[in-house]
Amino acid sequence: MGDNMHFLPADLSCTSLEEELLTYEHYSESEKSFFICEGVLMYLQPEEIETLFSFIRNHSGAHSSFVFTFMELDNDQICFRNSSALVEKWLSLRSEVFTWGIPRQEVRDFLASVGFDLVQIATDETLRARYIATANPEGLPLAQGECICVAEINVSQIERNRLL
């Protein structure tokens, strides 16, 4: 790992990104940063998600990236499409109830509303075609309904915010 790469784990159910990051000695708000938020947004409320995006947008350098996973909202349901009732029950018993999802076709507009640009969305089909198909032609089962999104801060949004 390079000297400029640091891993800062944070349990957002116990602390805020702001509390963790702004007191971290290696973080600079003016530098381009790369944020990863895997398996988190589906458990947050919409207001918490907007706060997270707002913080990243307002406290990181131009062209910073945010990679996150999200659950696809499908027929008003937030769930893994290929999971059994047993999986749903197991998640429920563990108090892992999904509270936020979004239809894939609405992600670009959502990101624009919070000051980000969509770079790429990877679905189970994308991952299979890109990484698994040649290594496992029999077809390793993948979770359907959770996607990976790569977003970048909209630079004009940063400039507008700094002028206010």
Regions found by a protein language model. Give the residues of each.
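Alpha-helical subdomain
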Residues: M1-L164
